Amino acid sequence: MAGVPGVGKTTVLQELEAVAREKKVSLKIVNFGDVMNQLFKKHGKNIHRDHMRRQDINLQTRVQQQAAQKIHSISSKSTLVVDTHMFVKTVDGIWPGTPKRVLEALDPDLIVLIEAGPEEVAKRRTADTTRERERNTLEDAKADLEWSRYMASVNAVLAGVPIQIVQNREGYHRQAAEDLLRIIESLS
């Protein structure tokens, strides 16, 4: 499951956990960035998660692959939901969040994009003071949403899986979580 910063992915996933509990659906959510951050620490890099993308691209690539393998090794009788991004803006340019070798390690059954309108994304980014972001313009939000769809399309082709898009409109995160759970349940 992926979404650009500002779509409300974290909020939707928190709500997804609550809805799944209510409906007695067993699922486990793993944040790809959290796993990467733990691995960076093992490499002696105790950095803020917003600074991971500023690290040497070779180190990022190694850690990204290690994170995918670690996530794949999680044995769970629950449905595994991987919280990630389709792309990352690094110092070297736009980098795929799930390049081919990472995608192969994760072996997804489905790709879900959480989206919101570009105006909402830009507004949420500006309001979120907990994150370190370079720019928060409407044009940036539009471009990021487009890049996310481009990358998701490539991933779907490579993995041979469908894409679903869930809208997270302002004030409707519960509806987005319910939509997401319906999609997850349809895979069973």
Model-predicted regions and their roles:
Residues 10:
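Walker A/P-loop
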Residues 84-128:
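ATP-dependent NMP and nucleoside kinases share a basic, alpha-helical "lid"
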Residues 149-188:
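NTP-dependent small-molecule kinase module
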